Structure formats: structure tokens, C-alpha cells
């Protein structure tokens, strides 16, 4: 299947997929050299039910998930939200993953500038071995994120995450506990740049973990997007404790702007 946004891209060590539901704005990229957009960025539209709006100058770099060779609309129906781009990247490796050493994800409401790309280029040039490096935008203490209790369903809290941690232990031969996660921080916002091999391991884990989370949520998708985001973060933390990631590097040049948020959630279910 021909996807124009992927044609004639310059060779690159990393690729960011910038996720949007409804619109893109030039304001978010007016301080980015067009070379960096062409080389390192593609804009991923999700949820086919929502019409897309964007400036003509970005159009050559925009694609929608339904255009991909392997496409599953059920991810959006099941409220995978941003994570549907993660899965479609994983399921279309020849197009979206394998040409690069790193793959990353950002969002339409983040204002970027040249520092982001210059910094990553510098790090990849200077680091002798970057294969265990996680570039992250934001991390927060894990405890408040994994202790979300509900009057009607206590499984929203620790029991759910103990199941997730035990699955990681089974898959990776480790013995991590809830306390190992509770006392550390996790990356959030679906916003990071990950080595290709680690991303593949993260998604292999997510394929098995997310159905379990859905089941533990009483087969209700209401809170599933929240938990999927934390699931990715917990995996990246456990991989760090497992010494498969040896450093977290803070990304500069990203301003997460609430005033650019798309009110799509008020009209549609993603």
C-alpha cells in the first residue's frame, strides 16, 4: 500500500510520530527548521470518524492510520487512543520502525523548537552506546498513578498493577514487586524516544498486559486509556530496574500547551 508521507524521506537515526485526532497548527512548529520536520517527523492522524484539518505545509508529512498496510480500527473503538499509533508502528515495522534506531511519540498540542532535534543528534553522536538510552519528556512518581481506587472496584489499584508486574516477571525472568514500582517514577504522556529493540519489547509486553488490564477493569473501557499510558510507563521503569535501560535523558525543546488542546473529546469517543 502506498503511503505518500513515507516516500522520499532522508535517512535518519530516529523518527517521531506526532499524534493528532482532529487538527494540526503551524504555531507548534514555527520555530522548527523545516529540515527537521522532513527528516525526523511524521504526523499520525487517529480515529477515522473525526475529520482532519491541517496546514498545507505539513500535508506531505501527514498520514492517517487507515492508510497503513496493517490497520486495525478496533484500537480506537476500544479506547486505545494515542496507543493505537504505538501498535500500528509495531505492526508496520518495515515502514514505521525498522529504518530507524529510535522511535518516538509526541502530540499535536506540544510546541517544538530546534533544540529538541539538535540535542538528540548531539547525544547520538557523543554517546558510545545509546542502545539502552530512554529520551523522555516527563516522568512522575509512580505511587499516585498506580493507586487509583474505586468504591465499586478495588482492582483499579494495587491488585491490578501487581498482575501487570507479575506478567513482566514471567516474561523476563525477574522478581520485581509492587514496592519496586511504587518507590520510583514512570514516564508519562506517551511522549518519549525509545531504542527500536526496546520499543518492540515494550509492545510485546503491552499485547499481553492490556487485555489483562481490561479484564481487571471489569471489561469496561472507561478508564482503559489512563491505564494503558501507565502500563507503558511501568514497563519502561521495570526495564530500567532490569538494567535493559541504563539512562533516562530529559528532552528539551518541548512546551506542552493546554491552549492548543483539541476539544474532540467533547464531541466524539476516541
Question: Positions of the model-derived regions?
Answer:
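ER/Golgi luminal nucleotide-sugar-dependent glycosyltransferases, focusing on the catalytic module
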Residues: 1-270
